[in-house]
Amino acid sequence: MNSTTERRRKKALLIVNPCAGKNRTRANLSEIVDAFPDGVFDFTIKYTTCQGDAINIARDFARKYDLVICCGGDGTLNETINGLMSAGVSVPIGYLPMGSTNDLAATLGIPTKLKEAAELIASGHTNGYDVGDCNGHQFSYVACFGPGTKISYSTPQKMKNLLGYNAYMINGFFLHLIPALADVKPRHIKIKYDGNVLEDDFYFGSFSNSTSVAGLFKFDKNDIKLDDGKFELLLVRKLSSPLAAFGMLHRIMKRDFDGDSLIFIKASEVKFTFEKPEEWTLDGECGGSTTQVDLKVLNRAVSIFSPENPMFSYKEEKEEATV
């Protein structure tokens, strides 16, 4: 068979979050489908109607399809991954990033322009990607605690739809982060990671597999591997004042890790023990509150359509060419 028309069309489950990114998906469904080359996919389209719905859709329907494509923000991708993994389904994942920040898309090199992202999926090129596990719940790129980490899920959806990324800036810095920094309260935590132990007062912590967190903190691409079985553990020790907190934010963005007040470690398993229940954020969504958090890396747990990228250690075999 030498032509697209002679090839079997692949069955694609398209999960659409109609509220993502200024309601772009709600208004432009036909544009989304038309972005793909003709004759490549047979689409079944399912809309999410509430938080957690993409988990249910992926879990209940994905095994009937050759691939799953999610259209929305990082939270929609998170739910899609959770649904696939809970069902034990290993079909490749396509991502059309239409959220307000799209941190993971930036890391993976997935275009934010719809047609380019669709063409990438149609090309068939995938990479094996590490997924995080937090007390049995999967996350695609970051788990974190501390001031400012609630910004994404505390920002009203209407504000996100109206202002996009600017909504995070307004809600984050003026309505949430500044008041939080005015009342800096470190947590006393015991941290075990890969056979090592830390115990001290900490202000912030994250466990991530990304070059960008919340669109604000940037890590050097040379420090990150997306499929090496390790995530990056970032810890900020107790700070003396709100002014010191702003200085620390600046140091994080400059990647000035001194190993004392600002700790940067690669690890495959981390256990946090808090004296009081602590709220966690997973991929920008509320991850619950608990005194003990067990984090681990699930090495190359999913296959995601993405371009060749030096942050991937392994060369993934290309899916059967579709165009």
How should these model regions be labeled?
Residues 159-168, 212, 216, 221-241:
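Gly/Ser/Thr-rich active-site loops/lids in small-molecule metabolic enzymes
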Residues 76-88:
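Short Gly/Thr/Asp-enriched flexible loops that form oxyanion-binding sites at enzyme active sites
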Residues 1-71, 311, 318-323:
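ATP/NTP phosphate-donor binding region
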Residues 2, 193-194, 199, 225, ...:
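ATP/nucleoside-binding phosphotransfer catalytic cores, i.e., glycine-rich phosphate-binding loops
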Residues 137-146, 150, 199-209, 213-214, ...:
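Short hydrophobic-aromatic micro-motifs
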Residues 54, 74, 205:
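Short conserved active-site loop signatures built around small residues
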Residues 48, 86-203, 207:
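Catalytic core of DAGKc-family lipid kinases
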